[in-house]
Each structure stands twice: as structure tokens, then as C-alpha cells.
Amino acid sequence: MAIKVLVVDDSTLIRSLLGKMIESDPELSLVGMAADAYMAKDMVNQFRPDVITLDIEMPKVDGLTFLDRLMKARPTAVVMISALTEEGADATFNALALGAVDFIPKPKLDSPQGFNEYQDLILEKIKSAAKAKLLKALPSASTPVKSSIKPALSQRTVNTQLVAIGASTGGTEAILALLKQFPAVMPPIVITQHMPAGFTCTFADRLNKLTRFNVKQAEEGERLLPCYAYVAPGDQHLEIIKVGGSFKAKLSQGDKVSGHRPSVDVLFHSVAQYAGENATAVILTGMGKDGADGIEAIDMQGGKTFAQGEQSCVVFGMPKEAIKRGAIHHVVELPQLGDKLLQYLASVNRD
């Protein structure tokens, strides 16, 4: 049975383009196109779509207000269509916190290749959203972390260990929830979240405001410090290297790996090579298989591996593949994942 899709956008051009893209795929059924939230509400009640593509910036009632009302009245998988601006990125992360499954930038239609790539991406995201588990918005997602007692890590652990995190669909909120479970003093943390250029800096800023330690977008050649987390820039692979006993960030715009740039596999393979048994890797919610090869390599090099449990995943794709390969030591639901990881780190390199 085809996936029923509703397009909500105040732009006639964008509605027309998205409509044609959706109609080109036999697995999808375009049930309606709405120019504003009032039309959208009627169409949601009439057609009961499986997935909604929703513009953030709309007249009368904006996309965020409509999304908030929708998730309370009739939870539906929503893919946000976002402007490539700082304000647009900010609103996008607010939408994800409210329960949107995923987002995609507005289409750039300056070349046939760009059009085709965008069509492939939006169709993939709609199909992924249709399979997603709708989780309740985390009540604490937009509030700073509260102090609580955490196991203290030895100075040696903080200076020698490295934590690597990979995620895709549903990952922005999962990463925030995980980082909020960590104390201020941690080994360096490196993060790859599938995300286009123009959004990762805002994502890092949001994590920085809401967690106990410093979070920033990774820069080429910078030393990876304890008490810092580093986010892979959109459209660039993040790797780690080791120079003179210190971990450093390496960025590149190489080919997509496992269908993505940044790729979790690229990060994890570098972590396996340079951190080895001093690595702790976590694979979170996401569609597809990115990260499974890399976390298997970390396991083979003696690192510790964790996967998010199915119940708390928006999409149990990436963790499932890694578990299937026998590469995961601990499968833990998100609310307990941080504490489990901390227990492990507290047990190594005791002074």
C-alpha cells in the first residue's frame, strides 16, 4: 500500500515541485497540497496522511505552531522543509524537539543534477519517516541540564580515552539526551550526525547551551580536548588522527561513504585506527547501515561499543545492523545509555 503524503507549503512553486517528485514514485501517494495551516488541518482530518512535508515559514499560523498542535491532536510523521539560514536552522531544531522526524533544506534548483539529487533525498526521507517511531517530545530537550551526581572519571581516563557517537534520523534529539547524561569532565567526544551544510553549527551551538561541557563544530587540524565535544560539519567527513600523543580533527570532502557525507563509518574507522582500545563508540537511532562497518572495526581493535535500544529509537536501522554483526557489547535504551557508558569509563584506567 502506497505511503500517503501531504505537502504543506505557502509557495506555489515548492508545492508543485514536491508534488511532482512525490508523484514520480509508485511507493508514494500524494493525497493533497495545502498552502497554509488551516487548509492543512482540514486535509489531515480528511486524508489521514502517513507523512507530511511541512514548511516552517508560513502565513497566518507558522509551521512550528501547526506542528505543535498536530503532535498533540494527531501525531504524524513530519519532514520539515527548512530555509538555509541561521533562523531557519534554529527553527528546524525546535521542530525536531517538538516531534518532527527529519528535515531537508529547501530545494536549490540551479542544475538538473541538483534537482535529481534533491528528488532522491526527499523521497528517501519521506519513506524513512513513514517507518519511523513517533516518540514523545523530550520534556527537558530545550532546558539546560540540571546537576546530578555522576561517577568521577580519573584524570588518566579523561586524558587517554575518546568517545565517538554516530546517528542519523532522530539523532539530533537522541544526541542531546545522551550528552545531558554526561558530567562536565569527560574525554574528548566526536560526533557525526547526518546533516547538510548550514545546520551543524547551529546544532553544535544548541548542544553547547544545553549540556555541561563545551560543544563546537570541528575544525581542521584542531586538537581534541577533554571536556569538549566536536560535531562533524555538514557535507564534510570528520576523522581523527593522532599527532604527538594528541588526537586531532581531520576534515575532508571525499566521496560519500555508505551514502553519506559526513559518514559515521568514516569517523568510526579513524577512531578504530588511532584510538583502538581507548575508544568508546555509540551508535544511535538512524535509517540504513552507516556506522556498522566502522563500529565493527572499533570492536576488533579492542574498543568498547554501545548501541541504542530499539524501544527508544526513532528508526532502528543503524543500531540493528551493528548488533546483527555482533559488533556491540551493550544494547541500552537511551534514558540509561549515558549512565551505562559512564560506568564503563569509570572502571578503566583507575588511578
UniProtKB/Swiss-Prot annotation:
Where are the catalytic residues?
168, 194, 290
Which catalysed reactions does the entry list for this protein?
[protein]-L-glutamate 5-O-methyl ester + H2O = L-glutamyl-[protein] + methanol + H(+); L-glutaminyl-[protein] + H2O = L-glutamyl-[protein] + NH4(+)
Q: Which residues form the Response regulatory domain?
A: 4-121
Where in or outside the cell is it found? Cytoplasm
Q: What class of enzyme is it?
A: hydrolase
- Which InterPro entries has this protein been placed in? CheB-like, CheB_C, CheY-like_superfamily, Sig_transdc_resp-reg_Me-estase, Sig_transdc_resp-reg_receiver
GO MF terms, alphabetically ordered: phosphorelay response regulator activity; protein-glutamate methylesterase activity; protein-glutamine glutaminase activity
Picking any one GO biological process from the record gives:
chemotaxis
Quote the PTM field: Phosphorylated by CheA. Phosphorylation of the N-terminal regulatory domain activates the methylesterase activity.
Quick one: a GO cellular component term? cytoplasm
CheB-type methylesterase domain location is: 156-348
* Family matches, as Gene3D superfamilies: 3.40.50.2300, Methylesterase CheB, C-terminal domain (3.40.50.180)
Function of the protein: Involved in chemotaxis. Part of a chemotaxis signal transduction system that modulates chemotaxis in response to various stimuli. Catalyzes the demethylation of specific methylglutamate residues introduced into the chemoreceptors (methyl-accepting chemotaxis proteins or MCP) by CheR. Also mediates the irreversible deamidation of specific glutamine residues to glutamic acid.
* UniProt-listed NCBIfam families: PRK00742.1, PRK12555.1
Query: This chain belongs to which protein, by name?
Result: Protein-glutamate methylesterase/protein-glutamine glutaminase 2
Which organism does this sequence originate in? Shewanella oneidensis (strain ATCC 700550 / JCM 31522 / CIP 106686 / LMG 19005 / NCIMB 14063 / MR-1)
